[in-house]
Amino acid sequence: MRYKESLLLPFLLAINIILPVTAQEKPRLKIGGALRFNYNYSDWKPESRNRGGEFDFDVLRLNVNASYKKIDLAVDYRFYPSSSGGGMLREGWIGYRFNDSHRLQIGLTTVPFGALPYTGNNYFFNLNYYAGLEDDADMGIKYLFHKDRWELSLAYFQNADLSGTGGDSELSASRYAYDIAGRDKEAHQGNIRVVYHFGNLWRHQLGGSVLMGGLYNMDTRKTGLRTAFALHYVADYRRWNLKMQYTNYNLRPVRAPGEDRSVVTMAAYGSSYRIASRADIYTVSLSYRIPVNKWFLDDICLYNDFSLLNKRVAGFNDSLENVTGCSLAMGKVFTYIDYAVGRNHAWLGDVW
């Protein structure tokens, strides 16, 4: 199979409004948002080649952050085109700050797994994202501890963000992050993430993450097992940044006799596809930031992000993704310029 290539230029305009309220307790409200457009040229699509690419609306984002005494509130809502799932809540939680080291969040909150917030630097994310193991938020409760050089996150998630479906209804594909869909549902998931920081001139981060939860099958009404673990390393030296992560996942649904258990359906952005039920994921991302601070340009970040999904299922071909590009920061405007190459990749191939 030949490699599929895509050139993407997303343009992001961000707006923030901070509204401090003058009162004795000093509640605080911050309203923000962004409007993003994409230019995309996909070499495997004849219509894209013939027209010289496509320039489209991507997303309108609304952010609300508020705090009062020790209570925090965070909301991130996205408005995508109907073909990409339409409106969806990316994150929405209420939190309590016991002190500077201990915090609690309840609601649709980010799953603590791997290098945060992302293993890469580009618009496309790395392959972890497409396996539901990066930039994902689920419904549950999360405890966060951060003191000196240590970070600890403990979380329990009752289920994925169901988007109004329940019972025997299949998971809606109108969602921001990839979750298990089809006749299987995520249930009763636990997460542990531990990170240690060290170094001064060279700043290092070593971390480990564990995920364990159920896979409820609506046909057999039995719960299988979902497990994943990751080891990550992040290094910063002056303008350089290096991120590396190894991830292993194993999905074991309990399906009716004769049904294929080697694949599991994932859904997001109004569409779904299948992934191997067992795999290792390797990611390496390197970036270099150049401060400019002249005219309209603040800085440039050059990067290369590579990820490989090694499928541990007989007869399956591995998937890979490599994105070379840069991001441009221009005040409230942020632009990615990415050259993406993929093989056996749902978003970089003939599926879409």
Named regions from a protein language model:
Residues M330-W352:
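Predominantly the C-terminal beta-signal and adjacent terminal strand-loop region
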Residues L9-N16:
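Bacterial N-terminal signal peptides
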Residues E25-S42, R51-S163, V195-G199, T283, ...:
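Outer membrane beta-barrel
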